[in-house]
Amino acid sequence: MAKFNKDSVGGTILVVLLLSLVCSIIVAGSAVMLKPAQEEQKLLDKQKNILNVAGLLQENTNVKETYAKFIEPRFVDLATGEYTQQADDSQQAIPADADKARIRSRSKTTEVYLVKDEQGQTQQVILPIYGTGLWSVMYGLVSVQPDGNTINGITYYQHGETPGLGGEIENPNWASLFKGKKLFDEQHQPAIRIVKGQAPQDEHSIDGLSGATLTGNGVQGTFNYWFSKDGFGPYLEKLHSGAN
């Protein structure tokens, strides 16, 4: 039998292939083992963001316990504005003239989060929103009071906008400008306005972001879409009337 020569060209190639195979197995195994931990962290981050916009996140908050105690997730059929028992993630194309958020499509249902008090009464409803800014899709949450119109708080938690400019959408000082503003006008049309420079002191206007007009336009488009009849409009109208 011929003796294996690891220093030959064939031997070198074989050693490289074996090492590559071993490394691939290690990497694949690590990915499988880490996936549950990654999914757990993803869920924890989601719960933190929800508690944060609800005003329930403090430095020493037990996220899982607080979320389980005060947050009730519900699925909403966006077309009817009614609660549904099951999620329907099938995508619906958004006509170009209606796609103010520039997201092209959305699922038929979405998850909303009811914020309860100690007696189990709903004090806020948290709605997920997303839309395209200058460089990225911007993901946020809006907390709305039970009247279906008054903003309790907002947060943007994921985006790729320019740090120090469009990235200021995640600045708590800017987010605080939304508190107490009204989502709709008297005709129940989306009424939030991102104003370049200093906004007038009214129920609907928000100061724009300095040096980030296009990101501000993206936020404007996001609110225009998600609080229209094609987004959360029907749901919030039912919430306001007490139908939900």
Curated annotation (Swiss-Prot):
The keyword Transferase does not apply. The chain crosses the membrane at residues 13-33. Its cofactor is FMN. GO terms for cellular component: plasma membrane. GO terms for biological process: sodium ion transport. It catalyses: a ubiquinone + n Na(+)(in) + NADH + H(+) = a ubiquinol + n Na(+)(out) + NAD(+). Keywords: Cell inner membrane, Cell membrane, Flavoprotein, FMN, Ion transport, Membrane, NAD, Phosphoprotein, Sodium, Sodium transport, Translocase, Transmembrane, Transmembrane helix, Transport, Ubiquinone. It comes from the Bacteria. GO terms for molecular function: FMN binding; oxidoreductase activity, acting on NAD(P)H, quinone or similar compound as acceptor. Pfam families: FMN_bind. It is a single-pass membrane protein. It is found in: Cell inner membrane. InterPro entries: FMN-bd (IPR007329), NqrC (IPR010204). The modification FMN phosphoryl threonine is found at T213. Its EC number is 7.2.1.1. It is an enzyme of class 7 (translocase). NQR complex catalyzes the reduction of ubiquinone-1 to ubiquinol by two successive reactions, coupled with the transport of Na(+) ions from the cytoplasm to the periplasm. NqrA to NqrE are probably involved in the second step, the conversion of ubisemiquinone to ubiquinol. Belongs to the NqrC family. NCBIfam families: nqrC (TIGR01938), PRK05346.1-1 (NF003746), PRK05346.1-5 (NF003749). Composed of six subunits; NqrA, NqrB, NqrC, NqrD, NqrE and NqrF. This is Na(+)-translocating NADH-quinone reductase subunit C. It comes from Haemophilus influenzae (strain ATCC 51907 / DSM 11121 / KW20 / Rd). The gene is nqrC.
